[in-house]
């Protein structure tokens, strides 16, 4: 059975020691879905939001968040990310925005948390910019889509 790597033999939370691990290329993809009204989504897509370009702001927020994950999540290592992408896709038929993030590096630990943080903060930024026009926006399905590299190997999430 797999054990929790962040818990020591006394049951205390600890940062994992990665000093003896080999450096490998690691990559992770994550997503979040933001559901809103048809009117709010149209305002964003048509560039009519009074706060400016919602997608550009959310993209930059997601990239910044990935780079600062280690400051937000207590046991994450500071990482030298080599690539961060945040893509936002309006899904007009369902009144949603699909946010997909990619983080990559050559290092001793994975980038799943960075990818998840990027997608989450991009979604939160959309909410923040749109809350004046709609309070009941829903952020959902924040999940890891894929990861590769490292000891645990390749993971691909099942389709939803």
Swiss-Prot record:
Subunit structure: Homohexamer; trimer of dimers.
Official protein name in the record: Cyclic pyranopterin monophosphate synthase
Principal EC category: lyase
Reactions it catalyzes: (8S)-3',8-cyclo-7,8-dihydroguanosine 5'-triphosphate = cyclic pyranopterin phosphate + diphosphate
Function: Catalyzes the conversion of (8S)-3',8-cyclo-7,8-dihydroguanosine 5'-triphosphate to cyclic pyranopterin monophosphate (cPMP).
Protein family membership: Belongs to the MoaC family.
Superkingdom field: Bacteria
Stored Pfam families: MoaC
HAMAP family for the chain: MoaC_B (MF_01224_B)
Enzyme Commission code: 4.6.1.17
One example of a Gene Ontology biological process annotation: Mo-molybdopterin cofactor biosynthetic process
